Structure formats: C-alpha cells, structure tokens
Amino acid sequence: NSEAALFGISELLVNGVEHGNLGLSYEEKSQLALNNCWKSEVDRRSAHPDNLGKRVRLSFRRESHQITLRIADEGRGFAWRNYLELDPRRASEPNGRGIALSRMLSFSSIHYEGCGNFAVATIAPLNCQ
C-alpha cells in the first residue's frame, strides 16, 4: 500500500528534521503544538546558522523479498524504544505516536542504530507490490 508507506516515510523524515537536526524535544513540541506556535519555532530553528547545512538522508534498497529504507539525521539521537508502541499516557498529547503508527501501518519492522539518529525500516513482500 503506497499511501501507508508514504505515511511512514514522511513521519520518519519529519522526525529527523524536527527532533534530530533541529533538536526539538518531545516536551517542547507538545507545548508548541498546544500553543499553536510549533511551525514558527521550526521555521526559526531551521533558519539558525547552526542548522542551515544539516540534512536528513534517505536511501532505499529494493529486493525481491522486501524494501529497506535507511534514514539518517544529524541529531544527537533519542531513546527510540520508548516510542515503538502506542503508549496510553501519550494518547491525549498532540504528538508522540508517529513512530508507533508507522511501525503498525507502514513497515514490517523498524529499528534505530547508533545513538538513535539512524532509522532502518522494512516493507515486507505484501507491501512491495
């Protein structure tokens, strides 16, 4: 399902920019979203000289049995295992569900390498067609 794959890929790319390259914490994003100033803060941080050259890189490999996506950002990483499952404590928060939803709807598997700034996601055969 290309729409489901696109959802997951978009989620990982946006996370790489916001949380990785721009250093926006979960708590900061929650507050900014609740105060309707999230986009202006992302724009402000994106324009900061320290962030101008930062990139999120996506590569993929299609094989007969799966597609493997590799997404890397230039951030400090994060405790990604905390976000693989939907957490009822975050159910009413404006953010914090994207990785779990991506894992459920878009990918056969997802994990992070290194400090958490390198995601590896796979799409299984049923989703490759």
Predicted feature locations:
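Glycine-rich/acidic phosphate-handling loop/turn and adjacent ATP-lid/helix
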Residues: 25-96
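Residue-level signal for alpha-helical context at structural boundaries
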Residues: 23, 30-31, 120, 128
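Short loop/turn motifs enriched for small/polar and acidic residues
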Residues: 10, 61, 124
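Conserved polar catalytic motif of the HATPase_c/GHKL fold
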Residues: 11, 15
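Short helix-loop "hinge" at the ATP-lid/N-box region of the Bergerat-fold HATPase_c
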Residues: 16-20
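Conserved N-box helix within the HATPase_c
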Residues: 4, 8, 98
